[in-house]
């Protein structure tokens, strides 16, 4: 029998033994990477190193998170390599973890790409400890008072008249007209800009491009955020191409926002004041640099531009897909207000079915189906599990809005549910189960929520009063439903964005057409 003499451990070179032991430890740690610790909430099975990363692209992320919620419960965990992600799927969990413990869970995760783009000056993504967040948040809350919101109504009504006239004259270019109207309104509120009647080649086009760049940055930042070592590769070297793109985007954004703030300052120096937000930050700089003030003002556009425009488009999709709802809104308008006058902002409160329709669109197609993530500063406990310090915490807004435990027939479009209960939830459920977290939770609730709802509500009310919306059978891009598969861009995980679509828009009658023309001529 052949015998082989193997060296004993005692006879090994100490350097070889140390290297072998070190390699074994490294391999063990590598294999542990991505595994779920026993104290975490449950979640889908992991793979060594990857954790659950290999599962994240199987379907549109909000739907995937919701599928896991049905299997693993109201709070579950994911592992993305060495990162722990906690997903909240119930109103109770959100209130307990984000609202009641907001001082612990109110931070944002660090993103090398977003940080390079914002230069640490965007309060939406900055830590609660920074002066950017503290002074910026205070300034916005002090500005968006009830009296200030009331002061915007005349301009909101003007822009809605301009929009109706645009659609009357040029319905096929609906998306651009909606974009023009909303951006013109925002530029007035933030910078005191006069109403702009065109889009292309104007400050409105530049402002929209600047405001939507941060979404493109966030969508394309996965690589460097997952592998932070890429941040250390110098610009110009392989693997650092993202830095060139981000810097170009940043320079463009800063140029646009600085120019807008400069314009507001020049108007103030000339004795012209409109009560805009820029005047407030210029009057009370609180030690902030001009670039900080520019980013604070521009943050209004970052947050409000794309979201409100997408929501209005989703409302139009719903009107086309559900003509019975469109008729009910119009019948309510005619019955409550009559047929011979244009509705005004104050009429919104007299139209319960319209308000229910607006809420149902937000529930079924939330603009932000997965809220921007929070980060925990300390270990937390929930349901017998530990949510460790540094965990990234997501609110699954899509999942809560489509939860059959909360809503009857959650996949159906039924505005009537909001006429039965204030939250649209099943009759008999506690008010505490209100799943309306569309504008955030805890320390990160969007301060512009009321402004957004007031503006979009007025626009949709007047569009329904003025026009009928139909599928356009002569156009290949027409729509007849609002299904995710047919109508929405599922390549974007953190937004519910309607794909471009065509429709037919016709005035309801000659009297309304004449009223629109008269109102526009009077602007």
From Swiss-Prot:
Stored InterPro entries? Cyt_P450, Cyt_P450_CS, Cyt_P450_E_grp-I, Cyt_P450_sf, Cytochrome_P450_fung
Transmembrane segment boundaries:
16-33
The pathway entry for this protein reads as: Secondary metabolite biosynthesis; terpenoid biosynthesis
Q: Does the keyword Heme apply?
A: yes
User: What keywords is this UniProt entry annotated with?
Assistant: Glycoprotein, Heme, Iron, Membrane, Metal-binding, Monooxygenase, Oxidoreductase, Transmembrane, Transmembrane helix
Topological category with respect to the lipid bilayer: Single-pass membrane protein
Give any single GO term for biological process: terpenoid biosynthetic process
Q: Name one cellular component (GO) term.
A: membrane
What are its E.C. numbers?
Answer: 1.-.-.-
Quote the record's binding site residues for heme.
Answer: 446
Residues carrying sugar: 82, 103, 122, 295, 379, 423
- According to the UniProt record, which cysteines are disulfide-bonded? none
Keyword Transmembrane helix attached: yes
Tell me the compartments it is located in. Membrane
Enzyme class comes to oxidoreductase
MF terms in GO: heme binding; iron ion binding; monooxygenase activity; oxidoreductase activity, acting on paired donors, with incorporation or reduction of molecular oxygen
UniProt cofactor(s): heme
Member of which family?
Belongs to the cytochrome P450 family.
**Summary of the function given for this chain in its UniProt record:** Cytochrome P450 monooxygenase; part of the gene cluster that mediates the biosynthesis of pleuromutilin, a tricyclic diterpene showing antibacterial properties. The geranylgeranyl diphosphate (GGPP) synthase ple4 catalyzes the first step in pleuromutilin biosynthesis. GGPP is then substrate of the premutilin synthase (PS) ple3 to yield premutilin. Premutilin synthase is a bifunctional enzyme composed of the fusion of a class II diterpene cyclase (DTC) and a class I diterpene synthase (DTS), with the corresponding domains and active sites containing characteristic aspartate-rich motifs.
Give the protein's recorded name. Answer: Cytochrome P450 monooxygenase ple5B
Tell me the organism. Rhodocybe pseudopiperita
Q: Which gene encodes it?
A: ple5
């Amino acid at each position: 029998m052949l015998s082989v003499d193997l060296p004993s451990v005692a006879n090994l070179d100490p350097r070889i033994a140390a290297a072998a032991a070190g390699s074994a430890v490294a391999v063990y740690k590598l294999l542990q990477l991505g595994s779920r610790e026993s104290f975490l909430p449950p979640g889908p099975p992991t793979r060594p190193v990857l954790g659950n990363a290999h599962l994240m692209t199987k379907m549109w992320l909000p739907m995937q998170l919701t599928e896991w919620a049905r299997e693993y419960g109201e709070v579950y965990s994911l592992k993305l390599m060495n990162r722990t992600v906690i997903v909240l799927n119930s109103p109770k969990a959100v209130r307990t973890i984000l609202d009641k413990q907001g001082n612990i869970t109110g931070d944002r995760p660090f993103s090398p790409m977003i940080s390079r783009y914002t230069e640490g000056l965007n309060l939406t993504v900055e830590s609660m400890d920074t002066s950017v967040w503290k002074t910026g948040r205070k300034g916005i809350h002090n500005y968006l008072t009830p009296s200030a919101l009331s002061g915007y109504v005349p301009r909101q009504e003007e822009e809605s008249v301009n929009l109706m006239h645009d659609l009357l004259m040029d319905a096929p270019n609906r998306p651009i007209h909606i974009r023009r109207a909303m951006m013109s309104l925002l530029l007035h509120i933030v910078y005191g800009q006069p109403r702009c009647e065109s889009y292309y080649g104007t400050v409105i086009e530049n402002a929209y491009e600047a405001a939507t760049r941060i979404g493109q940055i966030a969508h394309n930042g996965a690589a460097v955020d997952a592998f932070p070592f890429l941040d250390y590769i110098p610009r110009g070297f392989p693997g650092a191409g993202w830095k060139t793109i981000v810097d170009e985007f940043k320079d463009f954004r800063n140029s646009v926002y600085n120019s807008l703030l400069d314009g507001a300052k020049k108007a103030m120096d000339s004795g012209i004041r409109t009560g805009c937000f820029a005047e407030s930050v210029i009057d009370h700089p609180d030690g902030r640099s001009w670039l900080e003030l520019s980013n604070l003002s521009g943050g209004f556009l970052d947050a409000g531009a794309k979201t409100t425009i997408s929501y209005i488009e989703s409302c139009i999709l719903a009107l086309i897909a559900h003509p019975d709802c469109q008729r009910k809104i119009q019948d309510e308008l005619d019955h409550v207000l009559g047929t011979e006058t244009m509705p005004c902002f104050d009429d919104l409160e007299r139209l319960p079915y319209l308000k229910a329709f607006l809420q149902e669109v937000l529930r079924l197609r939330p603009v932000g189906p997965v809220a921007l993530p929070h980060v925990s500063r300390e270990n937390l406990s929930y349901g017998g599990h530990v949510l460790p310090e540094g965990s990234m915490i997501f609110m699954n807004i899509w999942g809560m809005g489509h939860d059959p435990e909360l809503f009857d027939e959650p996949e159906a479009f039924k505005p009537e549910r909001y006429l039965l209960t204030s939250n649209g939830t099943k009759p008999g459920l506690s008010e505490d189960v209100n799943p309306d977290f569309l504008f955030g939770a805890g320390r990160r609730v969007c301060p512009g929520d009321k402004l957004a709802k007031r503006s979009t509500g007025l626009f949709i009310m007047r569009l329904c009063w003025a026009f009928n919306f139909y599928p356009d059978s002569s156009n290949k891009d027409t729509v007849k439903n609002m299904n995710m598969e047919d109508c929405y861009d599922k390549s974007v995980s953190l937004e519910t964005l309607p794909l471009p679509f065509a429709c037919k828009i016709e005035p309801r009658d000659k009297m309304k057409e004449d009223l629109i023309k008269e109102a526009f001529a009077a602007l």
